[in-house]
Amino acid sequence: MPTLQLLWMKWRNTKKIADSNKLKTMKERINYSEVAPGALKAMRELEKYVAASGLEHSLYELVKTRASQINGCAYCLDMHTKDARVAGETEQRLYALSAWRETPFYTDRECAALEWTEALTLISENDVADNLYDSVRKHFDEKEMVELTMAIVAINGWNRLAIGFRTVPGTYKPQ
């Protein structure tokens, strides 16, 4: 990851800590599922497509958790770490996810998916270079690339809904 990007991420995280008092009293702005049920239905259809795509469930949960870490979505982090645990994910891998490059805990395929997740989640800050695409493609066929990308699109959409409307974390119960 380029040094400038790391510095920006550190600054952003520091700013979030400084704003934490505001978040402790967080109140939901809009219950979007009640106000616009059609919007929720559209997002759920995308989620159904991705869930049925054939991507490994564990991979999908890692992607959702990593994008939610980057975006700072507390609600989605609460949800997806709970779902990952229920599905058998280890605490070690969940705790190390933000530093996945520094650990031996993830497969090459998972690392490729996490790298693609970071690139697309931070797309306004990065170019999605051909060498990155080629590297990820070694682990995913064309259909899987589309499915992985749709998974990243979906979680980034959910993150923006939850952050924008301040969906309060802590109430999600895995099924």
Residue ranges of each PLM-predicted region?
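Hydrophobic alpha-helical segments
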Residues: 6-175
